Amino acid sequence: MIRSRGQALLGAMPALALIAGAGLILVALGNNAAREAHAGAQPLFWAGLALIYAPITFRLLGGGAGRGERIGLVLTLALSLYVVKVLRSPAEFVRFDELGWWRATHEAVLTGSLFESNPLNPATAGFPSLAAITAALSQLSGLSIFHSGLIVIGLARAVLALALFLLLERITGSARGAGVGIAVYACNPSFLYFDAQFGYESLALAVAAAFLLAALRWSRIEWTAVGPEVAGTAALVTALACGLAVTHHMTSLAVVGFLALWLALRTILLRRGESEEVRFKGPLLPALAIAIAFGLWFAFVAGGETLHELGGVFSRAFNSIVDLLTGSSGSKRLFSGASESQPLAARALAIVSVVPVLVLIGAGLRVLWRRRTRDSLSLALAVVALLYPVTLGLRLTQAGSETSQRASEFVFLGVAFLAALLLSGRTDRGRWLLARIGLTAVALLTFAGAFLLGELQATRQPGPYLVGAEDRSVTPQGLAAARFAAAHLPPRSRVLTDRTTATLLGSYGGMDPIFGRYADIALPRILFAPGFGHAEERAIHGQSLSFVVVDRRLGGEPPLIGYYVESDESGAFARRRAIGLGVLEKLRSVPGVSKIYSNGQIVIYDTSELTR
């Protein structure tokens, strides 16, 4: 009897989990083939993704699964796709943001301080939750920072999926619709890699989803209610608001904006007498809790870090849009890096994949209109979904692409709601089996296209070294140089080098990479000027640069992301030829500069004599 109940509860979930496991094996085989540049790497990888996503989505679309099975399927989908990200680099962190957070966590383990300055990511000093949790787990368990980070983000991914499922279920009243909503949410361009990386946004999304679920529970408590439920829910809302405020700035601001929208729509409906929500508490307490918590944290702790990061992101996006509209600059080449272009089929798929999302939004809005919906939360989520076309427009500019990418995980909450709404209350009739097959195929196309849209072709899978290609520029030579620095150079020595090497030296190497300018001299000039003169020596002295590190491979081709060191360096996004090897090796003959390390590709020069 127990066995039959368990089988009824889990349904097809164990079998689909086994199929997802087979998909992960294909992904791993594809990545291994990609590391050796073998043919068949991409077909194996994409077949693995399809084997994970399509069968689970097909089952979620059907009406035969029970609530428990749907929860299991949602968790299986979310965690299987998380493992896809882990398989991209299963031995260490290699992404830029991840290495910045590794540095922050390592400092927390060594010093016990959560607010140490971080040259790779200054925001870590203002939002220390991820570093604190990971450092605590590492110290208590004896696990490395890498493995502790994987566990923390894996748990966050599970919480995100479960909380969103419960949120959508409570809004629509349908477990079936909620499950489909999660499958649609997985189609946002950030879901597979960006929001699965070891970074504060990955953790914050889980906290935000739990907070919104608690806010929904509070909003539906009647004004006349008293007792432990009211006090407990209020305490939970407050605790989650505080937790979110100290975890991530953009997620906190997005939640503040959403709750303000929800509250405004509720107020309008109540004043018109068009809503029955008057007897419920509504979202006022959650809105005040997150606004006050983030406001205080911003004012007393993280204001500088928030303005530095978000101010730069939004100002660059705004300037890019103005330049595009005024003709000062051309539009960005879609679905490519500065020196990378995707195949025509991939570009076509990425473009076509946005069509089902637009159709879904239109269909969902039509349902809301026909039902004369007067629920303020549903209307607020619909408004969020309407921001999706706006984010697509931002991708026409170089800087706007970053803003669009970061907004997708928030906008897709509204899209997921509309998908859940469309499936809620539906009965399987007529040719629904054929319709399920067709919808699964469309969902798979959308999922694949979103990944093409959100991730550079070069970084979807591992492979041979490429210049200025984020993950693909991290190689054993760079890691060896970082290990040498950690073992033999003074900790936190000031060093100048390219972006990838700076990331490795600043994390695993324990150095302090320096960016920016000295007076009127751009620091990348030290690396890329044809010769070494008074200006370069002055910059080294003024910035107290103890070491300059040169990767000779930079002379092989232009950087894929458009720049070698910083996005505002001279020639950024406009280079058509690589920097000459002679330019990179000019420090060999500079008096007072000595070569102290070389592994054939990466050379470390001691420039401390020039700082005296």
Question: Where are these predicted regions, by residue range?
Answer:
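Hydrophobic/aromatic-rich transmembrane helices and adjacent perimembrane loops
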Residues: 41-44, 194, 201, 253-254, ...
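Membrane-interface alpha helices of multi-pass inner-membrane proteins
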Residues: 212, 225-228, 233-249
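Membrane-interface helix-loop-helix junctions at transmembrane boundaries of multi-pass membrane enzymes
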Residues: 61-63, 223-230, 270-284, 359-386
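Extracytoplasmic
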Residues: 17, 421-612
